[in-house]
Amino acid sequence: MQTENLVAIDTHVHIESNTDNAADQAARKYFRETGPRPTPQEVAEYYRSRKIGCVVFSVDERLTGRPQVPNEEVAALAADNADIMLAFASVDPTRGFDAVSEADRLIAHGIRGFKLHPPLQQFHANDRIAYPFYEVVAAAKRPVIFHTGHSGIGTGMRGGGGVRLKYGNPMDVDDVAVDFPDMPIIMAHPSFPWQDEAISVCLHKPQVFIDLSGWSPKYFPANLIQYANTLLKEKILFGSDYPLITPDRWLADFEKIPIRDEVRPLILKENAMRVLGLDGKVKVGG
């Protein structure tokens, strides 16, 4: 990624199949998303035209019935657009040896990190079944993004579409941070209804970060803004959740909230460079 040419780095961008099942329809309604989903190359062109770098991934889950874009396709997209893109992979860590061998293979092929979604993958982040997977990732010092908090996926569906919100509690991630102190962790989203817990985990564990994706900044809780301006100013990351929320919308709303001028470049770019190992220094957690 050619960071010197970028104004920001979006740490949370989905590459998705162009499906339209019930879960997709509910998510579009929740996020007020309109229009067709962008193709992978349209995603690249969107970000390049705005001089924004992005971390791209799909999600390996079977709960919603939405097919995963293969990790290999995401990696190939990022390789073809290496000036602006980094590829993360998604693996279901509850698959035991298969998850471990898949992680090993992906790391050997240069994947830059991993994305996990406990509510959709139906596991607690601190379940010991996932620990062999974490051991491989931690040894390679690759970052892991964990979905935390409420899930827009399933909202409004009968039975929440089967999505159990308990799996999004950031206190589960605290255990992982204790047991794998050399593995950089990004807790995705303002973690409603556990925002205080997420702030505490991020403050307490040096390798834990928070991305601000999935919410318009105008809805950020006051305590999140307070800590982003002060004690967590070097641990908060710009993320949009594109295509559900566009960077255009997110950045316009971000301009209107009371973030200090000297903190804005940290959130928009500099903190991401550090956790992603793009600043030429030893990666966080290493």
Annotate each PLM feature.
Residues 8-11, 55-57, 88-89, 115, ...:
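Active-site neighborhood of phospho(di)ester-bond hydrolases with catalytic His/Asp-centered motifs
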Residues 16-19, 61-64, 93-97, 150-154, ...:
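Active-site environment of divalent metal-dependent phosphoester hydrolases
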Residues 12, 74, 106, 114, ...:
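Conserved, mostly hydrophobic/aromatic
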Residues 46-47, 106, 137, 176:
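Generic structural signal for hydrophobic
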Residues 1-14, 20-49, 53, 232-237, ...:
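Mid-to-C-terminal alpha-helical segments outside catalytic/metal-binding sites
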Residues 53, 61-155, 164, 282:
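Active-site gating/metal-coordination segments in enzymes
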Residues 112-113, 127-237, 282-285:
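Catalytic pocket-lining loop regions of alpha/beta-barrel enzymes
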Residues 8-18, 145-149, 187:
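Histidine-centered catalytic micro-motifs
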